[in-house]
Amino acid sequence: MASAATTTHFPSSRIPSEPCASSGPLFPDDVLFTTEASSASSSSCHVENDSRPLSPTMFTDGRTPVNISAKHLKDHPLHEPTGTSEVLTFYPTMREFKNFSQYIKKIEQNGGHLKAGIAKIVAPEGWTPRPTRKDFSDVDDYEITQPARETIEATEKPGAYFKRNVTCRRKMPVREFRTLANSAQYRNPRPDLKGSEIEKHYFDNILHGEPIYGADTEGSFYDAQVEEWNMNRLGTILEDTNYEIKGVNTVYLYFGMYKTTFPWHAEDMDLYSINFLHFGAPKYWFAISSEHADRFERFMSQQFSYQNEYAPQCKAFLRHKTYLVTPELLRQAGIPYATMVQRPNEFIITFPRGYHMGFNLGYNLAESTNFASQRWIDYGKDAVLCDCNKDSVKIDMTHFMAKYRPDEYTTWWTYWYGGGRELWIPKKKKEVPKKRRQSLADASKIAKRARLGASSTATDSDGSSGSSGSEEATEGSSFMRALPAGYTVHNWQLRPDYDELLRKYKKETKLLRSDTRIDFYQEREFNHARRAEWPHCAVCQYFQPPHMNAINHTVPNSSRRLIPKWCFSKTDTKKHEDHHEPPPPLDRLLTCSNCHVTVHSHCCSGGGGGGGDDDDVTSSGEPWRCPRCRNRTDVEIRTTSCQLCELRGGALIPCQIGTDSTWAHVACALFNRRAIFDCPNRPGACFVEPSPRQQSETPRMPPRRLSEEYRAELGDLYENSRWECVVCHRTDEGLAPCVLCIEEQATTSLPTLAHVTCARRVGFVCEVRDYPRGVVMICHKHEHSYLVNKTTQQQAYTNVKVGDFVFVEDVVEPPQKLFTRGAIVRADKKETVVVDFLDNSCSRDNHVEDIISCECLFCENGDHQYGARVKVVWDDKQVYDAYFRGKGQMIEYTVRLEDGREVRHPRNRLKTKRELNAYLKK
């Protein structure tokens, strides 16, 4: 079998998208490499300082043979994978081995970081880090600093364990440690075991014994003159830090004995790490790729939430290195993991945010440190850090961002360090005097009786109209009158009480958070309660403002959809359609027989039985189930949660992000600008493009791709970086930005960002806009911002008064503009309404009577509910859909033109002579 140096290069059409796992070794012809590499001679592939990241290398997934000498293979036997994924093992030549950073690039170009979060590198045959010495006899004279006795405790959750360390000595000579490690009390009782037998024996006896670990001892056993992979000078960008961080940019030694354990963790600041085993018994590793890191963190938080003693209180609790779970629990949760055995003269590389744990199989010595590449910067810039331990590692990323990410630097620094991150604290609730409370309660009852009179008439369908009660009591509430009998108004505020909703948020979501113990009963109760709210669909409800709740506990067979089809397709399907399309049709409502979630058949049927127009049962006669509950085990159903937010409940569909097969709320996928649905009509799954820092792709993406116009409409900062949700304070990618913040704030400031599920809980409104904006979220900061903007707009104009001469734009054929001179004869204060149109424009000078209909649950005298859908007559006499923002005031000027006509206009439609000259010069 040919070695890497004599590999024949094949056309790129044969190159797979990921490393091949078929029979035979994985050679360069199985992986992608550059045109230059393909045309170069085989000898040029091994230049000492080769700058090409994809030059040949040899690796295996453990199931395929490798072309190395028999002696080398005996010293470094292949590890047959025992997990659900594989760790790739690489075999560099001596020439490749000379350039550390370049070889790490090769590993990542070959997908080594995606398989399991770690990779093994077997040092070239004959290489040693100590060429001046033949043995390690000098190690006995070394002193271990603060060796720790390990105790592992069982938790209430079977298969979940907690590790404690107690320093047993201030110092211990290695000679004494070696004697202890090889004694009958501490040595490995079954060194003959292989593969999964090693794992089983370890976890079966995990609670027995208290081994001593000589970890985190400063020092190195490399010869100073060794250049290759010398941990004291790896030459990566981490050396740009101008201060020493013990064990991070310095080297630590690890003296192990059987069963000494390093629990699940990712490296400090999500750095890379390198671990080299000098001598002794192997290390046994478990690893999880960064593609599954979010899901793994959520899973671990769930497992340890059953007992207060072990429940995580820190957002970065896994950095404590105290939590362990069995492989069986990972299998049950569907989290891919891999295993690897590390032997002497072998390196293990861990990648940014790659989780790993392991244990030693006997007395051994390893050394380790951290390093970085430019790819790491995108992890380190928003790494979630431990704040409960004063000794936790923190690296100032300012230098790295300024030097390597100059385009992002200002926005990043302003957000994290310059006061740009919003800390929303609800205002203290004021105590209302008892007499005042009574008068408010009486007024509330009177108003409520008037409103409920509007819903006392039965109708045949959700969209038909009826009338009842006095005209005064139902003024402006035609939408409420149109609802069938049985609806009551539980929340009728003109504007959401954001602070009150935020105060309730933590209590109401405590049992629905996806990082706490699983409680499927609470999810069902939540879904059952939510389905009573009009329009009853768990997806469309996001587009009905939460302060406008109409409740009917008898769910109808159908209701109106609030989300147009193009929002699911995320394409410009309206380009050639009539702007004034008819109202969305009624759509059949389906309720899952298992989790009780209710959805429109076109919002989330998943293509299963019951998605048709005539039945809500499967072809076999079974009651309809949602995609989450369909053809899945009880364990799978209960452990399902959304990958794009932090809350349980609601309509979930399968979601593929890179190679991670997970789940997402339909609503979360609607707002995520990297997500695309498998089908815009009755979506059953979604696919999300992974962050560029992952260097991966999502397989099986639909051929219909997201356009650059859509993806770039709000920028890519929110999708490609992790920011903090203003509501739950969790740090995630893909948070929904407030669209009004984007329009009103400085370019260096980030808008309010939130998970859409959190946003609706605290009163933020979700609305539909024309392509390419799509669905948008509006935060709490804009409840009265239209008044501020109005004042600012008025100040931009010169004051005019009765008697002044002005110029008015007259009506002519576009694009011509004709300005007619006239005199102001009257100025009247007028009440106006502020509305946002679907084309993203905002009008601030419409008259109250320009709104001809609304979907408020109750309104009077032109006071509509904030965020209500309204229909507005524009100057062209056409009717347009819009969202109500508020009421204001303007001065309307009556101008008598020179031809005798009188016209009425607001100030922004008039120009003084100076303003006209400036306009014409443009």
UniProtKB/Swiss-Prot annotation:
Disruption phenotype: Increased H3 'Lys-9' and 'Lys-36' trimethylation levels on meiotic chromosomes leading to trigger p53-dependent germline apoptosis. In spr-5 null mutants, suppresses the progressive sterility over generations which is seen in spr-5 mutants. RNAi-mediated knockdown results in extended lifespan. InterPro entries: EPHD (IPR034732), JmjC_dom (IPR003347), JmjN (IPR003349). Residues 453-475 have a biased composition (Low complexity). PANTHER family: LYSINE-SPECIFIC DEMETHYLASE (PTHR10694), LYSINE-SPECIFIC DEMETHYLASE 4B-RELATED (PTHR10694:SF129). Residues 1-15 have a biased composition (Polar residues). The keyword tRNA processing does not apply. This is Lysine-specific demethylase 4. The lineage of its organism: Eukaryota, Metazoa, Ecdysozoa, Nematoda, Chromadorea. Binds 1 Fe(2+) ion per subunit. It comes from Caenorhabditis elegans.
